[in-house]
Amino acid sequence: MSEVSEAEKRRILREKRKQKFSKGAGSARLHKITTQQPGGASGDSTVTSAEISDNEGSLQRGSNSGQSTREIDDLLAAMDPPIEPAEPLESAAPEVAFIQQLMKMQQGSATPPADEKAGGLFSPLLERLAEQEAGGAPVVSGEVGVHQFQVRQLKAYMLLLRWAILLPFIYYVMHPGTAHWLHTSRFLHFVMEPRNFFMVFTTFEVASISIYYQVLLTLERTNKVNSLSYSSKLVTWAGLVPDGMLPIDNLQGKVVVALHYWDILSMYLTDLSLCLVAAGLMKYYHAAP
């Protein structure tokens, strides 16, 4: 029973020492414990010199290891470059903010994608978006600026030329009796017949738009600039799609062709609508007393 009680006492003392050391008592607490003798304790319950030396050695090793750990942390902090503050998303463009959110979602995802092929397809797209974001908005050079000015000038000249012909044509179609000289020629009489209006108008539009596009292609070859590459975002975004992601070859080229056809159709529909409005106004004011 005496051995059991001595073992229990040693265990209790050891636990007390550990608690005091964990609370930061340090060597002062150890010195206080070793120098004082409890009044009610027997001689066998005192701490031996071997245990004291072991405890002091462990404390010294712990303090040395803590100091070395702090030195390593200081070295790593000195070696790491300073982190620049990230630019807030509010100051960036909406497209750039969306791209940054996509990149963060891809980098912060801890679970791997279920389909690795899909991830492989989207990775080139995100890389190209990141390259565009890093490069910023394309800088319009002097040659591109001159080309865009020439294209706008060409559109203005063609618009004036078309309506310089269309307005008299609409007037004489709506009022064929005002010009008797038109009946001297069978060709002019055929052109000015109201029932032939849409056929003549469509033929004129096809000819004028063809001339416009021929001159536009000549300007693009001379200046070596594609007009849609700098004026349409659809062409820019189609160029970012990597090959093989969609079952369409040369997606950017097909988008350019589709935009050309849409431009032709929009020009035709715009002129037709304005012609109908002009015809209605001429008929109304000519019929008024």
Curated annotation (Swiss-Prot):
Stretches with biased composition (Basic residues): 11-21
Localisation: Endoplasmic reticulum membrane; Golgi apparatus membrane
Name of the protein this chain belongs to: Golgi to ER traffic protein 2
Lumenal side: 174-196, 285-289
One GO BP annotation of this record: establishment of protein localization to endoplasmic reticulum membrane
GO function terms (MF aspect): membrane insertase activity; protein transmembrane transporter activity; protein-membrane adaptor activity
Transmembrane segments: 154-173, 197-216, 264-284
Subunit relationships: Component of the Golgi to ER traffic (GET) complex, which is composed of GET1, GET2 and GET3. Within the complex, GET1 and GET2 form a heterotetramer which is stabilized by phosphatidylinositol binding and which binds to the GET3 homodimer.
Location of region: Disordered: 1-68
UniProt biased composition (Basic and acidic residues): 1-10
Bias (Polar residues): 33-68
Main localisation: endoplasmic reticulum
Top-level division of the source organism's lineage: Eukaryota
Topological domain ranges for the Cytoplasmic compartment: 1-153, 217-263
Family assignment from sequence similarity: Belongs to the GET2 family.
Entry function: Required for the post-translational delivery of tail-anchored (TA) proteins to the endoplasmic reticulum. Together with GET1, acts as a membrane receptor for soluble GET3, which recognizes and selectively binds the transmembrane domain of TA proteins in the cytosol. The GET complex cooperates with the HDEL receptor ERD2 to mediate the ATP-dependent retrieval of resident ER proteins that contain a C-terminal H-D-E-L retention signal from the Golgi to the ER.
Keyword Endoplasmic reticulum: yes
InterPro entries listed in its UniProt record: GET2, Get2/sif1
Membrane topology type: Multi-pass membrane protein
PANTHER family to which the protein is assigned, alphabetical: GOLGI TO ER TRAFFIC PROTEIN 2
Gene source species: Eremothecium gossypii (strain ATCC 10895 / CBS 109.51 / FGSC 9923 / NRRL Y-1056)
GO-annotated cellular components: endoplasmic reticulum membrane; GET complex; Golgi membrane
Key words, A-Z: Endoplasmic reticulum, ER-Golgi transport, Golgi apparatus, Membrane, Transmembrane, Transmembrane helix, Transport
